[in-house]
Amino acid sequence: MTQRWNVQQDSLEILEMPFYWRLSNSVGTSKIPVRLPIRITARLEYDYLEFRPTDVEWQAINNAYQQNANIGFLNPESGQINTYGSSVNRFFLEVVETYAPEKTFEIGCGAGFSIQFLRAHGFKVIGIDPSEYSLEWSKRLGFELINDFFDEHLIYGKADLIFCNDVFEHVPQVDQFSKAVYKSLKQGGVFCFSTTNSTQSIALGDISMLEHQHVNMFTEASIYLLLANAGFSDISVKSGSYGNTFHVIARKKDSVIRKIESIKLASCKGFFERAYQKLTAFGDFYQKLGYSSHYYVPLRCIPYLATVGNFGDSDLYDSNMSWQGKYIDGYARPIKSLSDIEYVANGSFFIGSMTFHDEIKRTLIAHGYPEKSIHSVYTL
């Protein structure tokens, strides 16, 4: 086994990792590289981790979006509509009902799933999304779309409410993005969004949340700091009802004096030392059991497998039935489902997800796997 990662005092690099951007029916290649390096560093002033792509990697990310095959969790192809999607939409509906905005925009609206949901409850939303994918769905479903990239000039001072889902973690220079949203709101306007909660991963030195498209990994403190720095007040950061997410609300109220001195910092401080320990421990696990082990939750296991150069030597499992038999670009085996699990004597599983760890562990035990054969980030 060759170590395929480097950790410095202020950065972490995986030399090559599957560039997840679609689920395919075969291992066929695309015009986009299937594996690319990934590097992260810490923005300590805002207490979050930031992916630092090269120009080549940014081009690959842009091409992935343009090819219309990128799957967001609130798009029809994802299989997450009735779980994750339902949780997020209930949050957005609650905010819209509370503030009754006259002019509402969704940044990164994709197929318009949330727009359609709010429309069914009597609220009009204008989508903002530059993709051909979104344009096709706006024509199909009949919602209004600004088919362009969002910036501070696009809807300057016009919005009563702006919301987005699974966007905040994808945006480079998210501090500038937050300021652009602030400038786009009317006085008293509201910004709400759902984004990934990486607090636990950062605290443990865990890399399971790494994806090339997730350019930011946030703690609760980092959300407060970014929004307060942009000018927002009345900031609320709460856990979502499904998965490991933040549900965030903030308001544009210039008359309010913002106090951020009391926010506890340094969650990211020491992350790279902790990550070094986790990756070293995973390498030891892989040498002992990993070659024959199975891995549960593909997107969360792939970063670890990439650190040991495993791009298709092990079976990946997921509970989402719509993923069964599909391939992730850069990984040579199809994803298996619960129905494929069979107990094998002396077999083992590695659970990549912390969010659904306990649920998955119970499932594996029910299939006959003894607790001592089930491993995870917690046991490294």
What do these predicted ranges mean?
Residues I146, S236-K238, K336, I374-H375:
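General small-molecule cofactor/ligand-binding pocket signal
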Residues S87-G205, M217-I235, A250, P303, ...:
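Conserved SAM-binding loop
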Residues V27-R35, D206-A221:
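Acceptor-substrate binding/catalytic loop of class I
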Residues T2-N165, F246, K253-L289, I302-P303:
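Conserved N-terminal segment of class I S-adenosyl-L-methionine
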Residues E13-I14, F232-G243:
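Conserved S-adenosyl-L-methionine
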Residues H247-L380:
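Hydrophobic, well-ordered beta-alpha structural blocks that scaffold small-molecule cofactor pockets
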Residues N197, N244, L380:
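Short beta-strand->alpha-helix junction loop in the catalytic core
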